[in-house]
Amino acid sequence: MKRFCIACALILLQTLWGPLDARRFSISTNLLDYARLGTLNMDASYAASRHWSVTAGARYNPFTFREGDPDRQFQYRQQSYALGARWWLWHTWSGWWFAGKARYQEYNAGGLGDRETEEGDRVGAGLYLGYTHMLAPHLNMEFGLGFWGGMSWYTRYSCPACGVVTDQGQEYFVRPDDLMISIVYVF
C-alpha cells in the first residue's frame, strides 16, 4: 500500500508540475552591477512556456568606502528585490525579450560627486528590453536595459557621515534601472 501511495503521489506531482524536460531553469548575474561599487546580484528564472519566463532577483551591497575618513566617505549600499516576467520573441533563453518587474529597494547612496547623501525606500515597477545570445548549450550572454518608476520615501543628509538632515519626504520617480551584461547558466 505504501508503494502505491508513493507512486500515486509521484504521478500527481508530475501531472501538476508538467513535463520535466531540460532547460526550464536559469540563474544569472549582471556583471555591470559589480562595477556599481561591488553590488552583488543574482536572478533565478523559470521557463513557464516557450515564450514566457518568470524571474526573481536580488541585489545586495553592504560596502562603505573610506569609512574612517568622513570627508572622503562614499557608498551605494542597497538591498533590492524584484519579481517579474519576460516575453521571448523566439523561445525562452534565446533572442529578443521584453520584461516587466515589480521591485522594492532599500538604499543609502552618496559621497560620490557631491557630499549629499540620500537614504530611503523605493517601490515601483519597471519595463525592460534585451537580447540573449547562446554561447553554449547551457551558457548564455545577455544584454539589456530598463527603466523603473514608482514612489520613493527618502531622507537627504548634507554629508555621508554627519547626520545633518537637509530634506525628507516622498516623491514619484522614473529612473534608469538595469544596464545589463549578464552571464546566464541554463539547466
Residue ranges and their predicted role:
Residues 1, 29, 100-102:
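Generic cytosolic/nucleocytoplasmic N-terminal low-complexity/intrinsically disordered segments
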Residues 46-143, 182-185:
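Gram-negative (and chloroplast) outer-membrane scaffold detector with strong preference
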Residues 24-27, 66-69, 110-113, 162-168:
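Extracytoplasmic loops and strand-loop junctions of Gram-negative outer membrane beta-barrel proteins
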Residues 1-24, 187:
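Cleavable N-terminal export/targeting peptides
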Residues 18-70, 172, 179-187:
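Short glycine/proline- and aromatic-enriched beta-strand/turn motifs that initiate or cap beta-hairpins
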